[in-house]
From Swiss-Prot:
Protein name: Small ribosomal subunit protein uS8
Any GO CC annotation of this UniProt entry: ribosome
UniProt xrefs under Gene3D superfamilies: 3.30.1370.30, 3.30.1490.10
Family annotation (InterPro entries): Ribosomal_uS8 (IPR000630), Ribosomal_uS8_CS (IPR047863), Ribosomal_uS8_sf (IPR035987)
Organism field: Photobacterium profundum (strain SS9)
Statement: the UniProt record of this protein carries the keyword rRNA-binding: yes
Domain of life, source organism: Bacteria
PANTHER family: 40S RIBOSOMAL PROTEIN S15A
Function according to Swiss-Prot or TrEMBL: One of the primary rRNA binding proteins, it binds directly to 16S rRNA central domain where it helps coordinate assembly of the platform of the 30S subunit.
Length: 130
């Protein structure tokens, strides 16, 4: 069976992994998934990520916990294949009053809502993480 929305699959694996108190989760790799994992690591939501394998690359994300509680409280897909959500630079959302991030796909690549606002770019809202 083919996967219709690989980004939703990634976010669901992260959410389920943290609910089950897993140390790490594995998933098929893609450039966009690696970019999202890099943003999550940069913002402190995950501990580490690695890409292994040449023929079928696999992304392994090491989850992060604080006092036995998951660091990611909420992770939600916004723009999806059936309904794309685009926002201009002035309309970019602030997640949990700035405590969370919105991952935005811009013409300059994936970045957080704060970085997109600073660069004066709008784009597709991929997901919210808090």
């Amino acid at each position: 069976m083919s996967m219709q929305d690989p980004i939703s699959d990634m976010l669901t694996r992260l959410r389920n992994g943290q609910t089950a108190k897993k140390v790490a989760v594995k998933m098929p790799s893609s450039k966009q998934k690696v970019a999202i994992a890099a943003l999550l690591k940069e913002e402190g939501f995950v501990a580490e990520f690695t890409v292994t394998g040449d023929v079928k690359p696999e992304l392994e994300v090491t989850l992060k916990y604080f006092e036995a509680n998951p660091v990611i409280e909420q992770i939600q897909r916004v723009s999806r294949p059936g309904l794309r959500i685009y926002k201009k630079k002035d309309a970019l959302p602030s997640v949990m009053g700035g405590l969370g991030i919105a991952v935005v796909s811009t013409s300059k690549g994936l970045m957080t809502d704060r970085a997109a606002r600073k660069a004066g770019l709008g784009g597709e809202i991929i997901c919210y993480v808090a």
